[in-house]
């Protein structure tokens, strides 16, 4: 039921460095999206909490306050993730060659191959082999350095946060 979803939300923790990662990218003018095979009840909150521009995930069907066990179409699967990435890039007027995609599982492979730069973040071996770069530490802000973002820019974004 919805109460179980609330309990799950309160037990959710972000990857270390998530706030620094999103804050720095926003400060530098990046547009940020979540394209997840997870659930909108979580990604919508993460979007608001971290100031992310787009969030797409699977919607759980809830009838009379109870989960039905079904998903509402469209289902965010491997192929749909790539389609969403293309749609977001078009909406933001960003060429796919300038898009960075980060993933960890096989369901991310089509999306990763669509982007100009693809990064495995603690990814499965198949994802690491397909990626342009791989980050194998648990800190999401480590991705900033893969993107060539300077320490000074990270510190400036953090300094601007009260």
Which stretches of residues belong to each language-model region?
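C-terminal cap/substrate-recognition subdomain and adjoining C-terminal extension
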Residues: 2-162
